[in-house]
Design a protein with these regions (language model features):
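Preference for long, amphipathic alpha-helical scaffolds in soluble/luminal domains
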Residues: 1-292
Length: 292
């Protein structure tokens, strides 16, 4: 079993301080150095819009100022990390989500307000305004995890069930969103049945996306308690974690495994991905105890 060393964590911290956003500096400090969670909340404020949502390139692939579901998913993820997903700014963001939801109850992957602004090639505004599991499942799952009640969540949950229980093919990001939802939705029996069905799809299809990205078990099993753990043998999970430990680059970061379409996203995603790698390894007891 391979583990991160304290030196590896120090190298990651040096990369974060040298290259990443102020937000990731505070996320790293809060997660691994005993930093103040309030600083993460404060660092999110510049990305918040008057409509209650988040934008302003919080999610690096969408550079426009407007509030986007993917940016709100990111904000909620970071607030969940520091135990602050009950703050009032979450309620105002949910009010915004309610206002922009599609008729099916889901959120679009890209809101049309991105039109005219630089964005990744895969940030395509759909011709039909309809929900996507990628932001909807993740956001709904995080709200369920934190027992945060809001009018938006009911229809969004129904949408997620409809998609998860009927889908016949999924890409990596849809699967990750489904896992976040299934890990946290209250109906555990239904979640288990849906996870068994989804796991068979994941294991029998060739995973990947338009950019030819592949997955590793640790992408789906972010913690030992994840409902997706049953999709893999213990040996598969442990081997993938060994690979993750060994994937740290010379500069202290972990690699971004998708195309970088404009230079700044390399640093913005680099800090994000590096923190995510250490979080996963920490949850699987692959990091030194003094890290957390």
């Amino acid at each position: 079993m391979k583990k991160l060393t304290a030196v590896a964590i120090d190298r990651a911290e040096k990369y974060i301080v040298s290259n990443a956003r102020v937000l990731e500096r505070h996320r790293f400090a809060a997660a691994f150095r005993g930093g103040d969670p309030a600083m993460v909340v404060a660092a999110l404020q510049p990305y918040r819009n008057e409509d209650g949502g988040f934008g302003q390139a919080l999610e690096p692939d969408g550079r426009g100022p407007g509030s986007q579901p993917a940016a709100i998913q990111a904000a909620f993820t970071f607030l969940d990390e520091v135990g602050r997903l009950g703050d009032e700014l979450v309620r105002s963001a949910c009010d915004y989500l309610l206002a922009i939801s599609a008729e099916d109850g889901g959120l679009p992957f890209v809101h049309p307000n991105a039109n005219g602004y630089p964005r990744a090639p895969w940030w395509q505004i759909p011709e039909r305004y309809e929900g996507s599991l990628i932001p909807t499942g993740s956001i709904a799952g995080l709200l369920h995890k934190n027992k945060f009640e809001h009018q938006w969540l009911g229809a969004a949950t129904d949408y997620c069930w409809q998609i998860v229980e009927s889908v016949t093919r999924v890409n990596t990001y849809e699967t990750m969103a489904a896992i976040t939802f299934l890990d946290n939705v209250p109906d555990r029996g239904r979640a288990q049945a849906a996870a068994e069905r989804l796991g068979k799809i994941v294991r029998t299809q060739t995973m990947g996306t338009d950019s030819d990205e592949s997955y590793a078990p640790w992408d789906f099993v972010a913690s030992p308690e994840s409902i997706a753990h049953q999709w893999f043998t213990d040996d598969e999970v442990e081997l993938s974690l060994d690979v993750l430990v060994e994937s740290q680059l010379a500069d202290g970061s972990w690699p971004v495994r998708w195309p970088l379409w404009t230079p700044v996203t390399g640093f913005e995603w680099g800090g994000w991905v590096t923190i995510e790698a250490i979080k996963i390894l920490t949850s699987h007891r692959r990091a030194p105890d003094e890290t957390f």
